Regions:
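ADP-ribose/adenylate-binding Rossmann-like module
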Residues: 391-396
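Thiamine diphosphate
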Residues: 1-119, 124-132, 175, 280, 287-390
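Long, charge-rich boundary regions
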Residues: 253-327
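Short beta-alpha connecting loops at secondary-structure transitions
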Residues: 52-56, 116-127, 131, 157-165, ...
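Iron-sulfur cluster-binding cysteine motifs and their immediate structural context
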Residues: 193-194, 198-205, 223-280
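Glycine-rich ThDP/TPP pyrophosphate-binding loop and its adjacent helix/strand module
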Residues: 116-207
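C-terminal accessory/binding modules appended to enzymatic or scaffolding proteins
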Residues: 16-29, 34, 215-243, 303-306
């Protein structure tokens, strides 16, 4: 109770909010045209609520857009957009579309097909569901209009799409939204673009082509207007402080080669073909002969370790390595990793509990005030309520 009270009373001066990955399809798909608003749902697109995207409220899976059916009766607002992930659609989101059709709501569902359950590790959705199949499913729900928007529309030229389905390039997304918001009834945009994290994994594994082209911003030409960030909403476009003021640069390690930042009205971009990232020079092996072997404490009860850091920097990798080390050493580890969104730049924590084989533990979560060690890879996250709640002056 004392630990819980300390955690609740603690007010951190700043919080880390996660952001979409570089090249995330939601960078484009969650935009709304001027004068319109959107509603969120379950998925990484949930993060649009704390971005400048006029996206408000969210529901449980299968409830996307349902509140608008009631709200629309008491407002002069004529239309709303609703974001709906493909995994959620397969789970129960189709029921939300069905109720909207039955209610005669003026609403546009944006079904975001990213080919993976990105927020829990990039697994495929629990069943077969292609963009072509979605067009047929919503067509038979009797929606007013269906538009398939893709970064590679040419792959669907001869596809079996539902009758009346329009095929548009993602560069036309704003035009498509302006058209559909004026169509009475329920309309659907099937937005097809592979999850950025999954695209990066596939390129590393050699199962997806890696474009031989990179973009570089010439700081001598850049005026720091930020239009590249406005157009792309990409986390790989970073501020660059110079003697002439703040400019922009592209973090080449983060960039996933989407090139949407090129849409910015700017002459400072340089396109490089055949260029590769310069590798760090190999360092000599560290001399660890003078480092004494650590004294491993005898575990009489569960030993609890909390890791706190920034998403995308390897916090979950470290927790997995420590858990495997405990397993190799004959101990019984349990790990609870923070999941639910692609936490790029956001706060991430992992609970690692280690016990003896003859004294197993029942739950992976560290109880309030029970952490033996906190590895704070980032001071902001280590100072968060969630982390302070685990600490105790007598034990941590």
């Amino acid at each position: 109770q004392a630990a819980e009270a300390r955690g609740q009373a603690h007010v951190p001066p700043v919080l880390r909010l996660p952001h979409y990955c570089a090249v995330c399809p939601h960078n484009t798909s969650t935009r709304v045209p001027e004068g319109s608003r959107a509603m969120a749902g379950i998925g990484c697109h949930f993060m649009a609520q704390w971005m400048d995207r006029r996206t408000e409220t969210f529901t449980q899976m299968g409830g996307e857009g349902v509140p608008w059916t009631a709200i629309s009766r008491f407002t002069d607002e004529k239309h709303r957009f609703v974001n709906l992930g493909d995994g959620t659609y397969f789970h129960s989101g189709h029921l939300a579309i069905r109720q909207a059709v039955a209610a005669g709501a003026n609403i546009t569902y944006k079904i975001l097909v990213n080919d993976a359950v990105a927020m829990t590790g990039g697994q495929p959705i629990d069943g077969e569901l292609t963009p072509q199949q979605i067009t047929h499913l919503v067509y038979h729900e009797r929606v007013a209009r269906v538009v398939l928007v893709s970064e590679t529309p040419q792959t669907y030229r001869d596809a079996d799409l539902a009758p009346g389905t329009q095929l548009r390039h993602r560069d036309e997304m704003d035009t498509v939204m302006l058209e559909l918001r004026d169509v009475p009834g329920v309309t659907v945009i099937v937005y097809d673009q592979v999850c950025a994290a999954e695209k990066r994994r596939r390129r590393k594994r050699g199962t997806l082509a890696d474009p031989d082209q990179r973009l570089w911003i010439n700081p001598a030409v850049c005026e720091g207007c930020g239009d590249c960030s406005v157009q792309s909403n990409c986390i790989a476009v970073e501020p660059l402080e110079t003697g002439l003021g703040r400019k922009r640069r592209i973090n080449q390690s983060v960039c996933n080669k989407d090139y949407s930042c090129l849409k910015g009205f700017c002459p400072s971009f340089v396109t490089l073909r055949g260029a590769a990232l310069r590798k760090d020079r190999p360092r000599g092996g560290a001399n660890l002969s003078s480092v004494p072997e650590p004294v491993v404490p005898r575990i009489e009860r569960a030993w609890n370790l909390a890791l706190a850091g920034v998403g995308g920097t390897g916090i979950l990798t470290v927790s997995a390595i420590l858990a495997m080390a405990a397993h190799v050493d004959g101990k019984v580890p349990m790990v609870l990793d923070m999941a639910g969104l692609a936490q790029k730049g956001g706060a991430v924590m992992s609970h690692v509990r280690i016990s003896r084989a003859d004294r197993p533990i029942a739950a992976p979560r560290i109880a309030a005030g029970s952490a033996d060690l906190v590895l704070g890879a980032d001071p902001v996250v280590a100072d968060s309520k969630e982390c302070i709640l685990l600490c105790s002056p007598d034990r941590t």
